[in-house]
Amino acid sequence: MSAKADIALIGLAVMGQNLVLNMNDKGFVVCAYNRTVEKVNQFLKNEAKGTNVIGATSLQDMVNKLKLPRKIMLLVKAGSAVDDFIQQLVPLLSPGDVIIDGGNSEYQDTARRCDELRAKKILYVGSGVSGGEEGARHGPSLMPGGHPEAWPLIQPIFQSICAKADKEPCCEWVGEGGAGHFVKMVHNGIEYGDMQLICEAYQIMKALGLSQAEMATEFEKWNSEELDSFLIEITRDILNYQDDRGYLLERIRDTAGQKGTGKWTAISALQYGVPVTLIGEAVFSRCLSALKDERVAASKQLKGPNVNAKVEDLPKFLNHIKHALYCSKIVSYAQGFMLMREAAKENNWNLNYGGIALMWRGGCIIRSVFLGNIKDAYTRNPQLSNLLLDDFFKKAIEVGQNSWRQVVANAFLWGIPVPALSTALSFYDGYRTEKLPANLLQAQRDYFGAHTYELLGAEGKFVHTNWTGTGGNVSASTYQA
């Protein structure tokens, strides 16, 4: 059989199948392969019946069916499975062929694979794929990075199958090495933050006595304003959903799962020294939710405030919640972009931040009108150091911050946990504070560990004080704090 496939895809779980069908719809001939060959046969007989998709019975068979330079996309479980397939593929490939990892790989693994395959003259791309099963079928957000020479080879396919926002593709080259998977990781972390903020708004509304129908109406209203987004939209739908037993939401166990990508973002923030506090709290909130049995026991023993959530003007307070959610969302994205900026500096990536915002405008879980405002901010000033300093976002927080403070303060007085809303406000106040109490912290470190400190006006010169008159004058070398 002559080589006629434009691209091969390995891994026929639902995401893989949907991407194959998406590529087929856009006029590309796809060769489908799965480690279990029977899955290929079933796919061709069922979901891919009547399409131009062709199957392969082995990796060699798949390679033989591909046009040169070959393009092979892996959609398999992150980790050793990716390395195993790469190891099997390399002997079958020619210099200049392209391997694309479309799974949720850790960006360090992608960077390592780029280095390893560069030496073997194979081009490698690590691409974030967002949008879930529906996005894969009808248009995902794609975030490719790796060997830049691979981009012209895969660009026609990627920009054809991806989502479009204002007729622009939600896919652009991100950067070298692990840049694509890093940006996807931050996207997932921001997703954690957005979801947690919405959950906190829901919990406050619930405490105020709103019915699910009333909450759904409020989310519907927000979705027609500045909070217009996929997650607000689906929250409305979830609140409205009823089965034969009534509203489903209240019967769902309040223990949240996680696949680890939010945790990776929080860990990266610590490694790069960037205060991505909201995503961190969103991850920890899921961890706390998992302690269901302990929380049930604690609810019977630990006392809180003896007041019920109550406001004089409910519509006005619901508007406060909307502003609090919006201001916190601005902080969350500002923190995410801070993390990407620092990682870009450390890894020599030339990231296009406005382009990244555009990539997230459609096809992905965090898609929202708000991302267009971020794109505009970086168009106005490509060197913008922080989104909070952009005129549009400054004005938005100026308008909403009194509401934000009202909501957080009342939640505290009512004993309602709002870790994401409150940490966002604390970050905002910390970021706008000229002088933080870290001078005392430095003095403490120097007192017990001789870690030294800098004096105002003498930056770069580190000094130590003998605070008790009994210690020495040398700085610490072993005790770190």
Swiss-Prot record:
Substrate binds at N104, S130, G131, G132, H187, N188, Y192, K259, R286, R445, H451. It catalyses: 6-phospho-D-gluconate + NADP(+) = D-ribulose 5-phosphate + CO2 + NADPH. Gene3D superfamilies: 6-Phosphogluconate Dehydrogenase, domain 3 (1.20.5.320), N-(1-d-carboxylethyl)-l-norvaline Dehydrogenase, domain 2 (1.10.1040.10), NAD(P)-binding Rossmann-like Domain (3.40.50.720). SUPFAM superfamilies: 6-phosphogluconate dehydrogenase C-terminal domain-like, NAD(P)-binding Rossmann-fold domains. The keyword 4Fe-4S does not apply. One of its GO terms (molecular function) is NADP binding. Pathway: Carbohydrate degradation; pentose phosphate pathway; D-ribulose 5-phosphate from D-glucose 6-phosphate (oxidative stage): step 3/3. Its EC number is 1.1.1.44. The active site is at K184, E191. The keyword Nucleotide-binding does not apply. Keywords: Gluconate utilization, NADP, Oxidoreductase, Pentose shunt. Transmembrane segments: none annotated. Pfam families: 6PGD, NAD_binding_2. One of its GO terms (biological process) is D-gluconate metabolic process. NADP(+) binds at G11, L12, A13, V14, M15, G16, N34, R35, T36, V76, K77, A78, N104. Catalyzes the oxidative decarboxylation of 6-phosphogluconate to ribulose 5-phosphate and CO(2), with concomitant reduction of NADP to NADPH. Homodimer. Belongs to the 6-phosphogluconate dehydrogenase family. This is 6-phosphogluconate dehydrogenase, decarboxylating. It comes from Ceratitis capitata. The gene is Pgd.
